[in-house]
Swiss-Prot record:
GO cellular component, as recorded: cytoplasm
Enzyme Commission number(s): 3.1.1.96
Lineage: Bacteria, Pseudomonadati, Pseudomonadota, Gammaproteobacteria, Pasteurellales
Example of a GO MF term: Gly-tRNA(Ala) deacylase activity
Keyword field: Cytoplasm, Hydrolase, RNA-binding, tRNA-binding
Species this chain originates from: Haemophilus influenzae (strain 86-028NP)
Catalytic activity: glycyl-tRNA(Ala) + H2O = tRNA(Ala) + glycine + H(+); a D-aminoacyl-tRNA + H2O = a tRNA + a D-alpha-amino acid + H(+)
Name assigned to this protein: D-aminoacyl-tRNA deacylase
Cell compartments where the protein resides: Cytoplasm
């Protein structure tokens, strides 16, 4: 399971011209699910996202997690994160989870994160437009 997390001052996701999710300060989480993923991996990744210390403390050091920074999460499904790009000029999605498994684990990941702080979401399998203001920029690839 993969999360590309970006520290943002704001982010939103639109579907068919309508904003369906938006946050202020927090993390934009692009979530990719691979075919070997399960709830245990989702639990580990949620814990890592919620506790990863990438917000500045009073000394301007990355020392606070999103909860301590009183931030929010915008979680967006992103199947292309599971792509294999090692060969050729076209990505292979053979490592990606089936849509049913990916949706189940996406919803489960959202539920786990929402137990700790405010969460907005994209729409699974939709054509979405995501806009953000990356704060830093600060972007990390988390894989469990």
């Amino acid at each position: 399971m993969i999360a590309l997390i970006q520290r943002v001052s704001q982010a939103k996701v639109n579907v068919k011209g309508e904003t369906i999710g938006k946050i202020g300060k927090g993390l934009l989480v692009l979530l990719g699910v691979e075919k070997e993923d399960n709830r245990e991996k989702a639990d580990k990744l949620a814990e890592k996202v919620l506790n990863y210390r990438i917000f500045s403390d009073e000394n301007d050091k990355m020392n606070l997690n999103v909860q301590q920074a009183q931030g929010e999460l915008l979680i967006v499904s992103q199947f292309t994160l599971a792509a294999d790009t090692q060969k050729g000029l076209r990505p292979s999605f053979s490592k990606g989870a089936s849509p049913a498994l990916a949706n189940e684990l996406y919803e489960y990941f959202i539920q786990k994160c929402a137990e700790k702080l405010p969460v907005s979401t994209g729409q699974f399998a939709a054509d979405m437009q995501v806009s953000l203001t990356n704060d830093g920029p600060v972007t990390f690839w988390l894989n469990v």
